[in-house]
A protein has these predicted regions:
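Nucleotidyltransferase catalytic core that binds NTPs
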Residues: 1-164
Length: 164
């Protein structure tokens, strides 16, 4: 059975890693969709799709990474069309994992099974919070996996975020 998990991953944090592990405990293969892949260098979307892909790959244990595939999911103007666009990008999936009510509704309307992913400490483990902590030179390192931390340091995320 194949599952789909979509997120912006700006950046990929420990809450996202927990969601990936949760999904992998329920499906054989997990398609990870990097949402808003066509956006970067914006305050809300500062990192490129390739940078986010690198964060994900470097954060997932090698023993399970082969059960995942990562796909770029660009934003489209029509929400209803969005789920069908995804079908053109990723292989067949049986279940969608999400914590987003709108995503649940869109896929649910199509009769696709949707499983709610409960994100731990949502306010603390949010991309918005982590980006702000990085910008303010406050401790953010314990909120992201080591792989993400390495990527953020390599690309000088602190300087990028301060300049947006």
């Amino acid at each position: 059975m194949n599952g789909l998990l979509i997120g912006r991953f700006q950046p990929f944090h420990s809450g996202h890693l927990d969601a990936v592990l949760f999904a992998l405990s329920r499906v054989e293969n997990l398609w990870i969709g990097v949402g808003s892949s066509n956006k970067h260098n914006e305050k809300r979307n500062p990192f490129t799709a390739d940078e986010r892909r690198e964060m994900i790959v470097s954060s997932i244990k090698p023993s399970i990474i082969d059960r995942t595939s990562i796909f770029n999911i660009p934003d489209v103007d029509d929400h209803e069309k969005w789920t069908f666009e995804i079908d053109q990008i990723v292989p067949k999936y049986d279940i969608v994992f999400t914590n987003d009510e709108f995503t649940k509704t869109l896929f649910g309307k199509r009769g696709i099974d949707v499983i709610t992913v409960t994100l731990k400490e949502r306010e603390k483990f949010s991309g918005t919070n982590i980006r702000q902590l990085i910008t303010d030179d406050k401790n953010w390192h314990d909120l992201v996996p080591k792989g993400t931390q390495s990527v953020l340091e390599k690309i000088n995320a602190d300087q990028r975020l301060k300049n947006l």
